[in-house]
Amino acid sequence: AFKPDDLSIQICTVHCHLELKNYNEALKYYFKLDYLDNKSTKAWRPIAWCSFLTGKYDQARNYYKKIMDNQPNTQDFLNAGHTEWALQNIKGALAFYKKAVEKESGDFSKFQEQFNQDIPDLLVAGIEEAEVPLMMDQLRYSLSDIF
C-alpha cells in the first residue's frame, strides 16, 4: 500500500523537487519531514538553504541560528553568512565567513572556492556583483589579525 507519510517516500520526493530547483515545493516537504521526524535536525540545513534560495531570509536566519547550536560545519557558516548579507547585515556576514575560514583551518583558498560556487545565488539574493570582491577583501583583512 502507498503510504504518503512514509519518510523514505518524502525524502525521495523532496530530492526530486531540489533537482528541479522547485525550492518552494521542496520547502513544504522539508517542513513535513521536520514535523514527522521532530527528534532529528536533518531537515534544518535544507530548510535554511531553500529558505535562502526563495528569498525567505528571516526564516533562513532562524534555522541557521538553530543549526549554530548543533555542531555547525563550514557550509553552515558560509550559508549563514550569505543569509546575513542578504539581510544587509555586513558585520554578521563577515563574522560567519570568518568562522567558515577558521573551520577550514585558515585555508582561505578552500573557503573562496566554496564561496565562488554560491556567487550566482548571492546575485539573485540582491547582492551587487561589485560588492563581492569588497567583501572578500574585508574578510581577508579581518583574518590577517588571526592567521
PLM regions and their residue ranges:
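Terminal, low-structured helical/coil segments at or just beyond the last alpha-helical repeat
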Residues: 106-147
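Conserved structural position within tetratricopeptide repeats
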Residues: 1, 31-35, 65-69, 99-102
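Register position in tetratricopeptide repeats
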Residues: 19, 53-54, 86, 121
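TPR/TPR-like (Sel1-like) alpha-helical repeat modules
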Residues: 69-72, 82-108, 134-141
